[in-house]
């Protein structure tokens, strides 16, 4: 199979939405029957985002094969059917590590290792490898043109443009066309300078996607075309919209997919965007609204919980309601008490690390349990629910996780030291293991118990969800907790580890050790999120009753 490559760069400012634009174009091409994948090349030195602060970088998105990747891969999976893997995201740090490892082995036969050709060749190999088996591979280059960090990536894609030729490569550049209120017009000069910068390193863009808060007038499009040496039909206006799921239709309306397929000589059907039209209709026509309190420690940056936010919205579409997310810093609960939780239709405690704010999360779980308020715990959210139950129902005073208190008399949650991964390999960890890349990661089978809310949500007795954690329920306490009324509704592949818990006499109190938000999409949703939002709707109606 001959793979075509679309390279996506950004200029003027960061955060223009390269990932959304790339994913939206991929969605249109997929709707035309093409097999599409998307890659993200990140210019930072970290090997992966796994140990980066969520408040700096946003969430870490986990792929099926256990790669800890950039949150843009979450956008990719929400827009197209193709599942991402570790080949879809790599960093400068990963490239340098591999090149240096080869140098130590002697693979370069004593050569002087340089950015060109050794680093650029390694980048090109990764790009070509990631595109194998697909009709089209869209490659997003992180950062902004002009950044020193991005230069090796830009040089690599420049070389690929020459080596593969124009019939297999296309360069798409996102840029900002700001509107100046004082002048009463949009300004194209930043775009002209950005393209000049890009051309100075040998890349001539074929398509310009011009971002702004309004559509660009046709006369300004003509001006951009003239000064940037790009066909006028290839100057695409991408204005701000109230829903990112409207962007595929916006791009299609301007003929971007036709331009791409003709450039590549691809014969394919017209794009059918009816699924996206349905998503947009559901989003615009809710029959009600529920308020979900998200209790976490990274609440100052919503992107830290990007996939959870999106999964709640998707569940809202399924239940025909809009979901209002109220971010609650768990430390505020510790300081002010549970009155900050009043007026909610449900509580969600997402994953997290570290002791800060953990008691506030435990208080949130207790509030939900005692007030019959729908509760959904994810990863740490399951562990705090179990700790709360152990303390206040099972009579295990001062029960805790050894992550937060190594001297707790009742370590109901502890460091997992050994487990069997999805390939049947035995994985082992200990207290001194590195933080990066040492967690239980990736998609794993979960056995569900018949008659539970978990089995009801998944409409079966198994599910496959993705993990990212080091700590697990301590099996020593399972029998005592079960006797107190806790149901272990999901177990690992070998049935040795607790994957899900729930309360049978509660309207909806369900928690999982895995991260179901990573598999939610706007077209299909995710069973547990759909069940949680449905329970919030029912709680609200009963409350109003």
From Swiss-Prot:
Quote the record's activity regulation. Allosterically activated by GTP, when glutamine is the substrate; GTP has no effect on the reaction when ammonia is the substrate. The allosteric effector GTP functions by stabilizing the protein conformation that binds the tetrahedral intermediate(s) formed during glutamine hydrolysis. Inhibited by the product CTP, via allosteric rather than competitive inhibition.
InterPro entries in alphabetical order = Class_I_gatase-like, CTP_synthase, CTP_synthase_N, GATASE, GATase1_CTP_Synthase, P-loop_NTPase
- As recorded in UniProt, its EC number(s) are 6.3.4.2
Q: Does the keyword Nucleotide-binding apply?
A: yes
SUPFAM superfamilies from the UniProt entry? Class I glutamine amidotransferase-like, P-loop containing nucleoside triphosphate hydrolases
Where do the record's region annotations for Amidoligase domain lie?
1-266
Catalytic machinery residues:
379, 515, 517
- Positions binding CTP in this chain are 14, 147-149, 187-192, 223
Report domain Glutamine amidotransferase type-1 positions. Answer: 291-542
UniProt keywords (A-Z) are: ATP-binding, Glutamine amidotransferase, Ligase, Magnesium, Metal-binding, Nucleotide-binding, Pyrimidine biosynthesis
> Any idea which positions bind L-glutamine?
352, 380-383, 403, 470
Pathway named in the protein's UniProt entry: Pyrimidine metabolism; CTP biosynthesis via de novo pathway; CTP from UDP: step 2/2
Q: What class of enzyme is it?
A: ligase
Q: Where, by residue number, does UTP bind?
A: 14, 187-192, 223
Provide the residue positions that the database annotates as binding Mg(2+).
72, 140
Residue sites binding ATP per the record: 15-20, 72, 239-241
Q: Which family does it belong to?
A: Belongs to the CTP synthase family.
**Function, as annotated:** Catalyzes the ATP-dependent amination of UTP to CTP with either L-glutamine or ammonia as the source of nitrogen. Regulates intracellular CTP levels through interactions with the four ribonucleotide triphosphates.
Q: What binding partners and quaternary form does the record give? A: Homotetramer.
Name of the protein in its database record: CTP synthase
Which organism is this protein's natural source? Shewanella loihica (strain ATCC BAA-1088 / PV-4)
